Amino acid sequence: PPLGPIAPTAHDMRREHRVLVRLGDAFPLAPRSYALCTDPDILGVDFHVMERRRGIVIHRELPAGLAGRPELGRRVGEMIVDVLADLHQVDPATVGLGDLGRPEGFAERQLDGWGRRWHAAKDQAVPDVDRMLRWLEAAVPTPQVTALLHNDYKLDNLMVDPDDPATPVAVLD
């Protein structure tokens, strides 16, 4: 975990450990978490020890050996979407995570937050955004399906095969 001040719900090692333990075989890209330490005398923060996976994490640039392969971008992009869709297929209740989060009203809360952030940040009127927000608010599906979400899903929270970055090895964080 990062050391120093963090947002109250960010990097909750107890929650992360619990989720990784419960995902087990239901989502093979989740590394196993073997142990949780909550003793502040060890590192000063909670941490967990998880399975080592071998692969690379791509940040802003492809590693030198992978550059110059234009087909790679599309394959990696499709893989990112497929992996997230696979995670969403895991039923939280089936893996013992039915009590995680607050699924009721989730979409409404997200739209409300997006709208508030938009109105606080916009420096000019953009009618299309306001229209889109109204449309989304009117189109929230009912009933909503409960699914596991990764709150920081992005390329550098995926570990991929070093020889073929379109092959996922692990989902991190």
Language-model-derived ranges and their functions:
Residues 1-148, 162-167:
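ATP-binding pocket architecture of kinase catalytic cores
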Residues 158-160:
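Hydrophobic residue at the +6 position relative to the catalytic HRD Asp in the kinase catalytic loop
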Residues 173:
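Conserved active-site aspartate in kinases
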Residues 148-150, 155:
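Catalytic-loop of the protein kinase fold
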